[in-house]
């Protein structure tokens, strides 16, 4: 049985993390202030998620959860401030450790498959009348919507800006709300979930759909809870709908929005029957967790782009190759049907049950960039808009690095730090992205704002008007486009931009890298001149 295999897989992954001292990350903080019963913590870094954060006090872990010993009050992602409330204040001690523990989430997956049965969805989706669709839908988007309502398992594949969320997802959810159906909107991370909800709410407001049709389960960021209090499961705003009966809101809301980990933890207690499930950013979601969505026999629509980042997995490549029960944690959710067959480990995405719909037109990129992405990555006829994307380079080969602070770390480029500082200014919505952790550190050490400098994984789910990209060096795992995973990661970095991309690098070094994606981008770029 699939459930037995998945439960065993989760148990083995848990033991692997335990034996190899992995999965636990101490979250550093700058300072903390306790005013009974509230603890305010100023963090040094963003939290990846909120479902697996603990406070260790006197050697004991306290899960931060609703109505637990410690619960969330607010998380201000922009200012890196976490506010907690102690329901049992005597537990507090000045010497505490804030940490995230992946093992807790893996244990939840094991418990889920012990208690639930799963199967590929067979229930036909609700079929609404599609005579009143948005007037600006293109033919590909219309076909995608029709496919969602004609088959139990559908994958909508599209590059950034192709309308997966703003057009296809919104239109499908709108039709289901009109019919008073129950919908689960799921995403692999807090950030991805809130981005999807924000996009939907913009369309809801345009079309006159009540915001309270959506209920966001779990812990929102402070910015989200202040902007959309009526959507949140718990908020101190007086006008939120939860002042009455939380259980009633779960029953009456058409859309229950939650992270994938939230679905795993709460599905058994929700006591609702979903008519349709949508998983956004499915390619970034680990396959075992995505399998939990199959407990409902509700139609499932996967939305995403498998030519971008795959799930983060703490299992080494060599260990994955030795054991299939560990290996599946590196597979993404688009392989959902494969786990119910003997085709999963053939390393081939070969849909037989899943119906795919491809969106090949993007409004994010000009044709100049779309053609490069199609040539190297998508190879599906990707088209952009007529207006060109701004592609530029700044050559660092002759820049003076004398004043750059560094300790000779591996995988850094002081010259690129100089170049980035020449381009970056606060008058434009810039973000700096580099594949290398050490390069990010020295960029910040030399004056770049920490909240504007990202590794590729850290930039996932965010957008900026301009991206300054610091590639540092050719690396098989991070920048060598002959490695598909590195190529897809580079695609993520590029796709964070709305208007401009500036590649700050040693131009001659990269131009000599024949056949590389970065070389092709440089060939299509112009020298950068500050406007």
What annotation goes with each model-predicted range?
Residues 154-157, 184:
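Short hydrophobic/aromatic beta-strand immediately N-terminal to the Walker A/P-loop
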Residues 133-152, 159, 167, 258:
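N-terminal pre-P-loop "Q-motif" helix
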Residues 165-179, 199-201:
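Walker A/P-loop NTP-binding motif
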Residues 178, 191, 261-263, 268-279, ...:
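Conserved helicase motor core of SF1/SF2 NTP-dependent helicases
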Residues 1-146, 209, 217-237, 310, ...:
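Pre-ATPase regulatory/linker segments immediately N-terminal to the P-loop/RecA-like helicase/translocase core
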Residues 182, 197-254:
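A substrate-engagement module of RecA-like helicase motors
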Residues 183-202, 437:
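Conserved Walker A/P-loop ATP-binding site and its immediately adjacent core
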Residues 157, 163-171, 190, 195:
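Phosphate-binding Walker
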